[in-house]
From Swiss-Prot:
Propeptide boundaries: 17-54
Family that this chain belongs to: Belongs to the neurotoxin 05 (agouti) family.
Span of the signal peptide: 1-16
Lineage: Eukaryota, Metazoa, Ecdysozoa, Arthropoda, Chelicerata
Organs and tissues of expression: Expressed by the venom gland.
Molecular function GO terms recorded: toxin activity
Entry keyword set: Disulfide bond, Knottin, Secreted, Signal, Toxin
Disulfide bonds: 56-70, 63-76, 69-87, 78-85
Major place of residence: secreted
Organism listed in the record: Lycosa singoriensis (Wolf spider)
Protein name as catalogued: U13-lycotoxin-Ls1f
Length: 120
């Protein structure tokens, strides 16, 4: 069975290479016209579109307050008071504070850590 499979594979490979050579030689002899891609305009490079401003900032991006950060537990951490602010990881209390304070990007639920719970 294995020998039959190998034999069929070899015959198929020879057939593929021979038919490819026929097409190449016919193309070089101008017997075949080049095929035009009908959908070539579809794949043409389009003008780059301007990015729209996101409603929230991802981790490490600039922010003004906690409500600007996307994640439920993300907080806006600022260096030197109000300078160089960016979204960083917070905790469960951050999520609760955002739930009460934020109108946009308000967390639906706050994840609790499973580290302190006993399994048993």
């Amino acid at each position: 069975m294995k020998i039959l499979f190998v034999l069929i594979s070899i015959l198929y490979a020879v057939y593929c290479f021979s038919s490819e050579e026929d097409v190449d030689s016919a193309y070089l002899a101008n017997e075949l016209e080049p095929v035009e891609d009908i959908n070539s305009e579809q794949y043409a490079a389009l003008e780059p579109k301007e990015e729209q401003e996101r409603s929230c900032a991802g981790m490490g991006q600039d922010c003004k307050d906690d409500c600007d950060c996307c994640l439920n537990i993300a907080t806006c951490n600022c260096w030197f008071g109000r300078y160089f602010c960016s979204c960083t990881f917070g905790d469960y209390q951050t999520c609760l504070r955002k739930k009460g304070k934020c109108k946009r990007n308000r967390p639906q639920s706050c994840p609790r850590s499973n580290l302190n719970r006993k399994k048993g």
